[in-house]
Amino acid sequence: MKPNLALRAACCALIGLAGCTNLPKAKDYSTALGEPQSQLQQDPNWSGGRIWVRPGPPIGSQFDKKLLMENVTYIPGDRPDELNFRDNAELRQRVLDYMNAALRREFSQAGYQLISAPAPRSVRLRAAITGTFRNDRDPRPGEYVPIGYVLGQTAKAAGLRDQSARLLIEASARDATTNQLLIASMGAVTGSNLPESRKPTAADVQGAIDDWARRVREQFDRIWVAEIPKTP
């Protein structure tokens, strides 16, 4: 590797690691979900995720695994929309249809009961895509990819990687009867590699959606028995 290229690669690696502790602040997000983003904490089990859990006893002590799922939406804000969800209605709908099916499949297969109307001890789940990105190619397995690095696009600026399709997705869980907020989640996930000249398709983000659905379901599994992480 040429010296100048090696230096650039090293700098990008350092910037990426710096993102581990330099996650985007709440003011950097525009979403209609209205959750307490300033209180979101790094999820210790998901480098690309942040989470908030209502203080108090474990969620599972007061709620059954009954979910009232609302249809996933796309919320345009001041976050990048590099996959053109805002203007491409067909692409957006294909992605949302796949996402709704993936989320329902993930939770039902894990033993959650999906209901169609509010019931005692049930939870309402909402989710929205709030940012789309074409940035540096997904690193090799095992590389750490914090949200700050995903959104910062540092390696893309250096021209060292191909591009990948990425999504920023936010979700909330509320008491289906009282609407009290129980869980707020935000995560960045990576789909297929995208040549710079090719337009994105729904297939390019299906892997990212499957990953996100699994990650959120795993968050719920852990939260149902013990709240993580603790709010300082």
Regions found by a protein language model. Give the residues of each.
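C-terminal motif of bacterial Sec signal peptides marking the signal peptidase cleavage site
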Residues: 17-19
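Generic short beta-strand segments
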Residues: 71-75, 129-132, 188-189
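Short acidic/His/Gly/Ser-rich catalytic and metal-binding motifs that mark active-site loops
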Residues: 76-81, 136-139, 181, 191-195
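Surface-exposed short loop/turn segments
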Residues: 109-177
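N-terminal segment of the mature soluble domain
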Residues: 61-126
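Bacterial N-terminal signal peptides that target proteins for export
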Residues: 1-10
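C-terminal/domain-edge helix-coil "capping" segments
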Residues: 21-55, 159-168, 172-232
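Extracytoplasmic/secreted envelope proteins and their assembly/folding machinery
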Residues: 92, 96, 100, 104, ...
